[in-house]
UniProtKB/Swiss-Prot annotation:
Gene name in the database record: sir2
Gene3D superfamilies (UniProt xref): SIR2/SIRT2 'Small Domain (3.30.1600.10), TPP-binding domain (3.40.50.1220)
Catalytic activity entry: N(6)-acetyl-L-lysyl-[protein] + NAD(+) + H2O = 2''-O-acetyl-ADP-D-ribose + nicotinamide + L-lysyl-[protein]
GO biological processes: DNA repair; epigenetic regulation of gene expression; heterochromatin formation; negative regulation of DNA-templated transcription; silent mating-type cassette heterochromatin formation; siRNA-independent facultative heterochromatin formation; subtelomeric heterochromatin formation
Residues covered by the Deacetylase sirtuin-type domain: 139-436
Cofactor(s) needed: Zn(2+)
Ranges annotated as biased composition (Polar residues): 1-12
Free-text remark on how the cofactor is bound: Binds 1 zinc ion per subunit.
Enzyme Commission identifier(s): 2.3.1.286
Protein function: Involved in silencing within the mating-type region, at the telomeres, and according to PubMed:12867036 also within centromeric DNA regions. Required for the localization of swi6 to the telomeres, silent mating type region, and according to PubMed:12867036 to the centromeric DNA regions. According to PubMed:15545655 not required for the localization of swi6 to centromeric foci. Deacetylates histone H3 on 'Lys-9' and 'Lys-16' of histone H4. This has a direct role in heterochromatin assembly.
Organism: Schizosaccharomyces pombe (strain 972 / ATCC 24843) (Fission yeast)
Family, as annotated: Belongs to the sirtuin family. Class I subfamily.
GO molecular function: histone deacetylase activity; histone H3K14 deacetylase activity, NAD-dependent; histone H3K4 deacetylase activity, NAD-dependent; histone H3K9 deacetylase activity, NAD-dependent; histone H4K16 deacetylase activity, NAD-dependent; metal ion binding; NAD+ binding
Name by which UniProt lists this protein: NAD-dependent histone deacetylase sir2
Chain positions covered by the region annotation Disordered: 1-35
Lineage, highest ranks first: Eukaryota, Fungi, Dikarya, Ascomycota, Taphrinomycotina
Amino acid sequence: MASNPLDNNMPTTPVEEKIPVASYSPSSSGSSSGASLLVDIMCGSKETEDEEVDSDEWDKPETENISDLDERSEMVRYLRASGYAKFLEKYLIEEELPVRSILKKLGINLPSALEEFEDIDLLPLLKEVLKREVARRIKLPHFNTFEDVVNLLKKAKNVVVLVGAGISTSLGILDFRSDNGFYARLARHGLSEPSEMFDIHTFRENPEIFYTFARDLLPETNHYSPSHAFIRLLEKKNKLSTLFTQNIDNLEKKTGLSDNKIIQCHGSFATATCIKCKHKVDGSELYEDIRNQRVSYCNECGKPPLKLRRVGQNKKEKHYFSDGDSESSEDDLAQPGIMKPDITFFGEALPDSFFNKVGSGELEETDLLICIGTSLKVAPVSELISVIPPTTPQIYISRTPVRHTQFDVNFLSPYCDWVIVEICKRAGWLNELQALCDLPECHSGSKTRAFETDLDIKFEEPSTYHITSTTNGSC
């Protein structure tokens, strides 16, 4: 079995044994997974209502003075140069700084819920912060502009593309984490923990929650966007190594993209499986139930067994009839299993194809990574960027920026399609992209918006582009 390079847990070090607090035990002072979850919330950009802790992001220089930034930079440099153990020894042991002070100097503002915690109980959180800082990729300084991206695309031979829901928003499909996304809609309908809709344990106990809201995720179109077409264009040019998609709409396949190029990280609506007998069906068989907010049950294990009784005096005769009126027939009825679309819920393992690809070593050959329409908040897919060699150029295309890693060039736009069309125009690929978008499988509305909107392009140093419509900022 391939090793999992996404497993980067940091072991307990001898330095922690030197910490002069008798009550501290590295094995019992907190859950590393809990600390990881807290850092996910505190260090991710605040985009939706499902994130309950409203805290500062990693980098907000406008709220800090120069000396604070210099001190943080020095601490980070020391951490990267000397390692986790030396860092703890220097700041916790030698300088005797409280854990909460170190966290604050690193840009982590504790939520009020943690203010009453004993200082030493915050050590698992500090450990998680340091682990992430060490793993965080540093931007390559020599890739900054549109021209750099065009040159990278022309030279690349092993492009990895990672996409999220933002690639399909031009088709009218909701993303998850924007202000008007799916999670925000669930919150407005009173679902206190929107992500519970995709929790496998909740689904098994109360499938009505999923079936009440799933119709908003059901693909209403079989047509792809210009951004999908761009990925197919990369394959046609023999540049695409792998597409990792977090989407469940299955639209990537509508472009004609080869199956062996696609890793569906979170499954799709293409098929569905009974959680009881594992009977598998085409996903479209559930669509009527989903659209009517009705739980879908299995037609296979839900069939009542035929109760037969032999009649006639001659034992050699084989005449039987159904005894549907028997008192025991009601007991013989099988409880049908619940049908679940083959999408990956929280609490379920990702497909083997994902881990096989990540563990195969193929990603080490990547010469360009392009992330499109994803906030990179759901592990382990979000950790792919740490598997790609840090010297590989990385491009980010989405509506909002990410704070927990550094891409080389960022393109921020209400529609990813606008960015894609502009890149292809500058690369001399516009006619080829247009040809793919002229096919009947391409969504006509998204094609018109992508190719006919006049764009306003603003550059923000050192390497971020803001791309909007010249008329009203969007369209």
